[in-house]
C-alpha cells in the first residue's frame, strides 16, 4: 500500500479555490486552478503565485559549514561574501552524476541555507549527512520542515507583495537578483524564481503562510499550479530535476557546466575527479518546432551528427509554437535544422540558444 500524499499548509486553500490536485513527488499539489494558459499569461504579464512549500529549506551551521559546502557541491560557495547572497549549484555523486540541483544562501561563515527539491529531499539530507560524517566536518544539518514557501512571480510581483506587506519593502526593494533579506523575524524574502520573470520567493513560518496567501490574493495575485510552472520554466530555459537531469547525467550533459567551479585546484568537491576525466559526449540544446505539433520528453531527434532525444517539451503559450530541450550529439549548434519524430512523422525543428523567453518577451532565434 502506497504512503498517503504529503500536504502543504496551503492544501485547504487550493481545494477551496477549486484546484485540480495531483501527486508530485509524493506531495498533493495543485496542477491548475482552472485555465493553465491564463495562469501562465498572468505570470508573464502581471503577477502569479505558487505554493512551493513542498521544497525543503535546510539550515547548515557550525564551525566547518563553509568547508563542508565547498566539498559538497560543484559550484564554489567561497565566492559568496555578502550576507543574503545566493548561488545555484549541482550536488554530485562520485561519478559526477547530479544528485540534485540547489540554491545555497550565505548569511555568515557558520550560517547557510540550502533549498532542495521536494522529490529528492530525503535522499539529499542522507547524502549531506554521509559527506559530513565521512570527512569529519563539524556541521549541523537542520531540515526546516516548520517553514513554508511561496513564489510570487511576474512584472508586477514585487509591487503586489509590498502592497500586501508594506513593512517588507524597505528590506526587500534593494535586493539584486539571487539575493535575500530577512524582512521580519523568521521570514526571508529572496529575489529568485523559476519562471524567467522578476519576483520573490518568500520563506516564512508555516503557521503564517495562509494569511499571506489570502492577502496576496486580495492584491490580485493569481494562484498558479504546476502546469503553468512547467511551461514557464521551459520558456525560460530552466531544467527540471528528474526530467532534464538525474544521477546518471553530468552537468555538461544538462547545459550546466557554468555551475561547476574548477578554478581552485585544491578544492576537491565530490564528483570533481569524474568531471575532470569526462569527455562530453552530448550537447544540451533548445529546440523550436517549425510546424504544427507538440514535442514531449523522450521523443527521438535526428540531425546530421546522429540521433538525440528530447528531455522536455511543451507548447509555449508565449510563442505559440512547441519548444523543448534535447540531448544531442556534440557539434549541434544554434541555427541547425533537425527533425523530431512525432507520432511516426519526422517534423522539422530549429536548434536554439536558451532561453526562448526573457522577461516576458520572445528571444529572437535565426
Swiss-Prot record:
SUPFAM superfamilies membership: Aminomethyltransferase beta-barrel domain, Folate-binding domain
This protein's UniProt keywords: Aminotransferase, Transferase
Protein name, entry field: Aminomethyltransferase
Matches recorded under InterPro entries: GCS_T, GCS_T_bac, GCST_C, GCV_T_N, GcvT/YgfZ/DmdA, GcvT/YgfZ_C, TrmE/GcvT_dom1
Single Gene Ontology BP annotation: glycine decarboxylation via glycine cleavage system
Purpose: The glycine cleavage system catalyzes the degradation of glycine.
Subunit (UniProt): The glycine cleavage system is composed of four proteins: P, T, L and H.
Family under the similarity heading: Belongs to the GcvT family.
Enzyme class: transferase
Catalytic activity as recorded in UniProt: N(6)-[(R)-S(8)-aminomethyldihydrolipoyl]-L-lysyl-[protein] + (6S)-5,6,7,8-tetrahydrofolate = N(6)-[(R)-dihydrolipoyl]-L-lysyl-[protein] + (6R)-5,10-methylene-5,6,7,8-tetrahydrofolate + NH4(+)
Keyword Kinase attached: no
GO terms under cellular component: cytosol; glycine cleavage complex
Enzyme Commission numbers on file: 2.1.2.10
GO molecular function: aminomethyltransferase activity; transaminase activity
Amino acid at each position: 500500500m502506497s504512503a498517503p500524499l504529503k500536504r502543504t499548509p496551503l492544501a485547504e486553500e487550493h481545494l477551496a479555490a477549486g484546484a485540480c490536485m495531483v501527486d508530485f513527488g509524493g506531495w498533493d499539489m495543485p496542477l491548475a486552478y482552472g485555465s493553465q494558459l491564463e495562469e501562465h499569461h498572468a505570470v508573464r504579464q502581471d503577477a502569479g503565485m505558487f505554493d512551493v512549500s513542498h521544497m525543503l529549506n535546510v539550515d547548515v551551521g557550525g564551525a566547518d559549514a563553509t568547508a563542508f559546502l565547498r566539498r559538497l557541491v560543484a559550484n564554489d560557495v567561497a565566492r559568496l561574501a555578502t550576507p543574503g547572497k545566493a548561488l545555484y549549484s549541482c550536488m554530485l555523486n562520485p561519478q559526477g552524476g547530479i544528485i540534485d540541483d540547489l540554491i545555497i544562501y550565505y548569511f555568515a561563515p557558520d550560517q547557510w541555507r540550502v533549498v532542495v527539491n521536494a522529490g529528492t529531499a530525503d535522499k539529499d539530507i542522507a547524502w549531506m549527512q554521509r559527506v559530513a560524517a565521512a570527512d569529519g566536518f563539524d556541521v549541523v544539518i537542520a531540515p526546516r520542515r516548520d517553514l513554508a514557501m511561496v513564489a510570487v512571480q511576474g512584472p508586477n510581483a514585487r509591487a503586489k507583495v509590498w502592497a500586501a506587506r508594506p513593512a517588507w519593502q524597505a528590506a526587500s526593494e534593494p535586493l539584486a537578483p539571487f539575493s535575500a533579506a530577512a524582512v521580519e523575524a523568521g521570514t526571508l524574502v529572496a529575489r529568485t524564481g523559476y519562471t524567467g520573470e522578476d519576483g520573490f520567493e518568500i520563506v516564512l513560518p508555516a503557521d503564517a503562510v495562509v494569511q499571506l496567501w489570502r492577502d496576496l490574493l486580495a492584491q490580485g495575485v493569481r494562484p498558479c499550479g504546476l502546469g503553468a510552472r512547467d511551461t514557464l520554466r521551459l520558456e525560460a530555459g530552466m531544467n527540471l530535476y528528474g526530467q532534464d537531469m538525474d544521477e546518471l547525467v553530468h552537468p555538461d550533459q544538462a547545459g550546466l557546466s557554468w555551475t561547476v567551479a574548477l578554478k581552485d585546484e585544491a578544492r576537491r568537491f565530490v564528483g570533481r575527479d569524474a568531471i575532470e576525466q569526462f569527455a562530453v559526449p552530448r550537447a544540451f540544446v533548445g529546440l523550436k518546432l517549425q510546424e504544427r505539433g507538440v514535442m514531449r520528453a523522450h521523443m527521438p531527434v535526428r540531425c546530421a551528427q546522429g540521433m538525440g532525444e528530447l528531455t522536455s517539451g511543451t507548447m509555449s503559450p508565449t510563442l505559440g509554437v512547441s519548444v523543448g530541450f534535447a540531448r544531442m550529439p556534440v557539434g549541434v549548434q544554434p541555427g541547425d535544422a533537425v527533425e523530431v519524430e512525432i507520432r511516426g512523422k519526422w517534423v522539422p525543428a530549429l536548434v536554439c540558444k536558451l532561453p526562448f523567453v526573457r522577461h516576458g518577451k520572445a528571444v529572437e532565434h535565426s
